[in-house]
Amino acid sequence: MNANTPVTIVMIEDDEGHARLIERNIRRSGVNNEIIPFSNGTDAMKHLFGSDGTGIQHKGRALLILLDLNLPDMTGIDILRQIKENKYLKTAPVVVLTTTDDSQEIKRCYELGCNVYITKPVNYESFANAIRQLGLFFSVIQVPPACSS
């Protein structure tokens, strides 16, 4: 991944109204990157991990994952854990967007590796600021090339 690699936003949100609002807020904050929406965890996991289950197709790609914790088919916690345990996906920033403001769940998400935890309904300014900060992160990060032997 380099500074010219466009960031793809993967949005995992089962509520269609929330998904539209999130996308609108992203666009209002000036972000025009591709957004790939998923309404359930199963389809999102197939996309993230691919048909072989390794996630290798995302090697070198810049991803930003927006994750709801309350999905119809699996928990966002399980998705977060699997993303952060995968060698190709673990560096992708994960923004948790959920209605749950339980302090234990928030702590657990941060322990598993989420980068930002935002409680719905989303405060537009907080959300836009988080997205802008993550965009800045992507624009300044440089991954050193692999050493050849």
Q: For each of these PLM feature ranges, what is it?
A:
Residues 115:
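Short, glycine/charged-rich "phosphate-handling" switch motifs in NTP-dependent
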Residues 120:
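A Lys-centered signature of the CheY-like receiver
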Residues 1-10, 15-36, 40-49, 54-63, ...:
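Non-catalytic signal-transmission and effector/linker regions of two-component phosphorelay proteins
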Residues 72, 102:
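The feature encodes the CheY-like receiver
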Residues 56-60, 84-91, 112:
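Conserved phosphotransfer cores of two-component systems
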Residues 67-68, 98:
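Active-site residues of response regulator receiver
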